[in-house]
Regions:
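An N-terminal hydrophobic leader/cap segment in hydrolases
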Residues: 1-29, 39, 277
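Conserved alpha/beta-hydrolase
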Residues: 73-92
Length: 283
């Protein structure tokens, strides 16, 4: 098996979250004539020239991860693009590592081209299962910085913590220990020492492999899902940026790109149909 639903379960679809956040949704065209659903969080009056491509954790989707991403957007002042995974929320399909990794570069390149940006304007964030696509993306592109929270060396290592010998049934995908060797931008690692799901030693192992400049924060009280969002993650990221990155403070006038954003907001018919099916299933 490539993905195990017990190890990486997508949450049940919550229609009310879609209704609350539907104005933040954008749909990025993929290579197979389908669309990648994302949330686009930004200042309402003017848009920063800096974008954080955000990859959420397991057992959550782009809607559930909105709170963390919104805090990141507000404190850093950067825009945040939350990328959805196949099989999660309104993205039809099955969780597939090959597709997820392919989508990372599609989203990165699209945002960079759409808003006429440089690599210096691009940042990458990943948490839990999302750290591997984040590290992969940073290994094949040149973002300004990479932020990873609760990372792991490989999918097999994570599965082993939950299902023991069954880990050998998993195909070796999401091999962060290989990707990180090719990352050249500064990296900020956060991993709680009390994490029972992914031991913080997984992140320690990555720091020993990576060749780029990095900082490591390991709060003793922090578990996988229990932490102070601002003190443990958001504020340290902002401090890391200030100390390690050259930030472009330029702005994009939202009126100048309103038509382009409106086009991205338009929901493709295939996703409309899929949402109807999801609603019928939860009735």
């Amino acid at each position: 098996m490539e993905f195990n639903n017990f190890v990486f379960p997508a949450p049940n679809f919550e229609y009310h979250l879609l209704e609350i956040l539907k104005e933040k949704m954008i749909f990025i065209p993929s290579k197979d004539n389908h669309y990648i659903p994302c949330l686009f969080l930004h200042n309402e009056k003017e848009i920063s020239k800096n974008f954080i491509i955000f990859f959420h954790g397991n057992a959550e989707d782009m809607f559930y991860s909105n709170e963390m991403a919104r805090a990141l957007q507000e404190i850093t002042g950067m825009n945040v693009i939350i990328v959805e995974y196949p099989g999660y929320s309104i993205y039809k399909g099955e969780a597939n590592s090959t597709k997820i990794l392919e989508n990372t570069t599609i989203v990165y390149d699209f945002i960079k081209t759409q808003f006429n940006l440089e690599d210096n304007n691009m940042f990458v964030f990943g948490r839990s299962i999302g750290t591997s696509p984040a590290i992969y993306l940073a290994s094949v592109r040149k973002p300004n910085a990479l932020f990873v929270v609760s990372s792991f060396t490989s999918i097999r290592a994570v599965a082993g913590n939950l299902v023991g010998p069954l880990k050998y049934l998993l195909k070796q995908r999401f091999t962060s220990e290989e990707y990180i060797k090719n990352v050249t931008c500064p990296i900020f690692f956060v991993h709680g020492k009390s994490d029972p799901l992914i031991p913080y030693t997984e992140t320690i192992s990555l720091t020993k492999i990576c060749k780029s400049k990095y900082e490591l924060l390991t709060p003793s009280h922090m578990t996988h899902n229990d932490f102070d969002l601002y003190e443990d993650i958001i504020e340290p990221i902002q401090k890391f940026n200030e100390n390690n990155c050259t930030i472009d403070n330029g702005k994009i006038n939202i009126d100048d790109i309103k038509n382009d954003i409106d086009k991205l907001h338009k929901m493709p018919q295939e996703i409309e149909f899929y949402i109807r099916d999801l609603k019928d299933k939860v009735k």
